[in-house]
């Protein structure tokens, strides 16, 4: 219930699949299109279903849409959509939802100077943090880009810089394993 009348005059829509959590709340909504159709055609429809489920259960589900050959994930509270090679497990989806509230701002992280303490290393780590996170329109934390590229000379401490970035990502709850 709760579909826009412009989309469906009855206000009732039928989602293809809802993946439920152990707490009875929706973890994910899956919109499945025919194999001959572009999977992206299901994006808007899946978003509408997610809106309805969020209203009904007070938890925004992660959005998946697929045609059987291409599959996409979209955690629209944090990142833009991206193609994936397979579906996530129940625990993996629950972790994505849990991270919405437990993630810390990378830009305020104090780097362990025992790992990477040179000024240019600290500047590189700061730039990576700024590249990965932005402030949402509503003041919440949002993901910006999912990747960063550092170009550093031989002997400048690339490994230590990378280790400090991994330390930052894990301690701020952005990554579990690297």
What do the PLM-derived regions correspond to, one by one?
Residues 1-177:
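ATP-dependent helicase/translocase motor core
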């Amino acid at each position: 219930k709760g579909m826009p009348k412009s989309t469906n005059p009855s206000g009732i829509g039928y989602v293809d699949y809802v993946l439920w959590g152990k707490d009875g709340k929706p973890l994910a909504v899956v919109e499945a299109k025919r194999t001959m159709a572009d999977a992206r055609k299901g994006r808007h429809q899946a978003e509408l279903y997610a809106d309805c489920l969020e209203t009904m259960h007070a938890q925004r589900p992660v959005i998946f849409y697929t045609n059987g050959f291409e599959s996409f994930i979209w955690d629209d509270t944090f990142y833009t959509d991206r193609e994936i090679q397979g579906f996530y497990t129940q625990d993996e989806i629950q972790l994505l939802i849990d991270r919405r509230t437990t993630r810390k701002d990378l830009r305020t992280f104090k780097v362990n100077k025992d790992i990477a303490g040179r000024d240019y290393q600290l500047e590189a780590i700061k730039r990576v943090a700024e590249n990965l996170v932005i402030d949402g329109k509503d003041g919440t934390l949002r993901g910006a880009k999912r990747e960063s590229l550092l170009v550093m000379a031989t002997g400048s401490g690339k490994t230590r810089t990378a280790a400090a970035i991994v330390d930052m990502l894990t301690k701020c709850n952005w990554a579990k394993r690297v």
